[in-house]
Structure formats: structure tokens, C-alpha cells
Amino acid sequence: MSFSVDVLANIAIELQRGIGHQDRFQRLITTLRQVLECDASALLRYDSRQFIPLAIDGLAKDVLGRRFALEGHPRLEAIARAGDVVRFPADSELPDPYDGLIPGQESLKVHACVGLPLFAGQNLIGALTLDGMQPDQFDVFSDEELRLIAALAAGALSNALLIEQLESQNMLPGDAAPFEAVKQTQMIGLSPGMTQLKKEIEIVAASDLNVLISGETGTGKELVAKAIHEASPRAVNPLVYLNCAALPESVAESELFGHVKGAFTGAISNRSGKFEMADNGTLFLDEIGELSLALQAKLLRVLQYGDIQRVGDDRSLRVDVRVLAATNRDLREEVLAGRFRADLFHRLSVFPLSVPPLRERGDDVILLAGYFCEQCRLRQGLSRVVLSAGARNLLQHYSFPGNVRELEHAIHRAVVLARATRSGDEVILEAQHFAFPEVTLPPPEVAAVPVVKQNLREATEAFQRETIRQALAQNHHNWAACARMLETDVANLHRLAKRLGLKD
């Protein structure tokens, strides 16, 4: 099999049909998997010596949440170092990053792998990976044909990153600096709530407005603050953190505004406060609702006039600080109850942001679980950490009152328990490794099978044939989508369909 002009044109057309970058990336990966008849494909973005998945097909959903650091993945490091197509032999000693992450093939290791580094000029911006369960799966494709695919993918990714850079810097195309991948705090999640939050972060980051970030404990409010700072014009200056809930009343004013020598017992020298440290940068005040009313009044003055006074000093100091505040309380209710100043609330909430709880984020829980699994793999020196189907089902049906923080701790604990029950450096997390309160899981759906006079083989094939027909109908005869619904490999599905007479 080889590429024709029609095949390449079809890939290019699919890229143009996409609505937005993410849709184009997914169309590219899905089309490539169909054309190459491979078992899995992925588009990865390169940033700070790690590959970040942008789109996948044929891989477990949690792969989208993983961050593949080069030092922990020698195959990906080889792709990053190469300037051309990389083919890994079936007996390669380098472990494949996707071993155990192809649904329905968890117990098998990937046999065939091709890596295509993607460049914008001389800069590495990403990679395409193609994987198959057959050792000779990609032998029929020449390096030149694969280079054409890489060029199409590199063009799509390069354009997306350049547009992202221009938008983040509020520049016109003619003002663009030399291409450089935009570095931002990674906020993992594709749910509607997180997608909207990311858009709002992009909007407010370019301004100098104060921001009030609200959300339940453990939702990631500090990560939102970091994302705002890193995407703002103040990113070259410090982001200073202060947890207001951990401040004893006796030292709170000094922590915020500093003090001079002799201002109080123990003040043996002059000391800068958080506002001075954050001058020309950003100050993140976590748990702002815990500040006393007296301190709220002094904070309000800083926001109004831009100057501070160290404790024990009559002189004022000018500061240029952007304030980001976070709370897990309803500050409107706190204002009505007299525990929070209304004028300070309005000063802080010029641009309010709300971080959704994990229970409202759908499949984001699986992406985040993948991220934490990869963290555990690196920290504990394991070759792989994967979630079983039962574990994924459990995570999707647990409410996580502690939100993302609870999920992180649950994954770390589960890895420790799983390691204790099996030898070796490969860990599979099962449902029993999670110590959640009782979770009611939906019963598996079992299709009714009519009673017919058939032997077991004929009945099995009839059931398979009807199941595939229904899945195809529900997915508009898209074989890749059908395979995902049936949780099987698309190449295996094609072979089964041919055997059952559903495909020529």
C-alpha cells in the first residue's frame, strides 16, 4: 500500500473542514489511522522537554492527560533528537510509552512504532506517533511518504501555535516575533466548563484587572492564578503567593505590607512584605475570605491608591501590583452577613472566575487520572502505570467531594497498594485499589438475544454481526468511531467485519 495524491488531498481537506484547532487535530489523527490502518495514532506538542498529547485515536482516553517527559521515555527522546522519520524495530529495547494504553490490548506490548518529529523552521514543535500490534505494520510505507504526512501535520500545528502566540501577545501578524512555542501552565480538561474557563483566562490575562477566583476546595484555584499570570504582560516579573487562612492576626499586616526595625518585639531588621515582593508583578491572595475586617480596610486602601505603609513606618511606598484573589466561600453571602467588606468585594471582583467542581467535569476525571498516573510512574521509577476498565468506571461514577486534590491523593495511594500486590515495575490500578465510600455503578447493558436454533459459533457470530451493524448505524458508518464505541481496535474490527461478511 502507498499514498496517492487523492489520499494526501483527503488529509488536507479534513484539516480544512475542522472547526477550531482541536477539531482539526482530531480529524488529522483519525484520518491517518484509517489511511495507515494502524492501531493507534497521536499528535503531540513539544514544550519544555516534554510531549503533551493534543489528539489521539485508538488509545485510552487518559493518554490526553499524560505529560510525557523525555527523561522518562527514551523512545520519545529519540524522536525529539531525530531530524527525520524514526522507525523502531519490533524487538527494540526501548519501552513504548503506549504499552498497556491501547483499549482491548492492555496485556500486549506495541510491536510496530513510527515517530515523525514536527518542525517549524529549525524548532521542534511536536511529533506524530503511529503504533501497531503487528511487527511489520508500517513496512509498506516509504520514508518519503511518511515525510509528506509529517509536513501536513507540522503545518497544521505550526499555524495553531502561531495563532495562539499572536492572540496571547495581542499582536497583528506583521508584528509577530520569531516563532516560539507559547509556554503556559497546563490546565488539563476538555469539558465545557473547563473550556469556558480557559477562554476567560485568555481574555482577562491580557488586561491588568483584579480577578476573584471562586471554587470549592481542591478545584485548582491556584493553578488558575498561575495561568493568568503566565499569560499576562507581567509574566517576566514575580508571582507572589500568600495563604490568608494561615496568617495569625498578629503578623498578618507585616506579611502583607512589611515592617521596619523595632516596629514590634522581634522586628530586628527591616522586612519587605508581599506587596513589595510582587512589585510590577502579581500577588495571589488565597482564601481572601479569611482576612479580618481591619486588614480588609488596609488592603482596600492599597487597591484604591497603590501605596503601602510598612508597620512602624510613616512613609508610604508606591507599588504596582496586580491582585488575584481566591476563595471557597460565597463572598456575596459574607458581605450580607457583615464578615466581608462590600467595597473590597467590588474592588476584587472586577472580573470574577468560577472553577467548576470535578463532579461537573465529566471525562476530565480520566484525563486528570492519566496525568497523576504518569507523575507516579516517574517519581517511583515504574515502567508503566495504567488504569483498568473497572478503575476508570469507578472514577467516572464517584462524586469526589475533595475535587482534583482528592483524585490526586487517591491515585498516589492506589499505586502504592497496587505495587504491594504484584512484583515488577508495571502497575495496573484496579477498582479495589481505591478506598472510596460505596459507589453505585450502573449495571452493564446486555442486549437481548433472540432464541434461535443455532450452534454456539453461529449464535456468537450473529450477535457480533448485529452489534457491529448497530454501532455503525449510531456512528454514521464511521469505522473509527464504531471501534471506539465497542472499545476495540479499529484494525481488528475491520478484520472481524470482513470475516462476518460485513465488509468486502
UniProtKB/Swiss-Prot annotation:
Which amino acid positions bind ATP, per UniProt?
A: 215-222, 278-287
Top-rank taxon? Bacteria
Q: Which residues bind DNA?
A: 479-498
DNA-binding keyword on record:
yes
- Pfam families linked to this entry: GAF, Sigma54_activat
Transcription as a keyword?
Answer: yes
Q: What name does UniProt use for this protein?
A: Anaerobic nitric oxide reductase transcription regulator NorR
Gene that produces this protein: norR
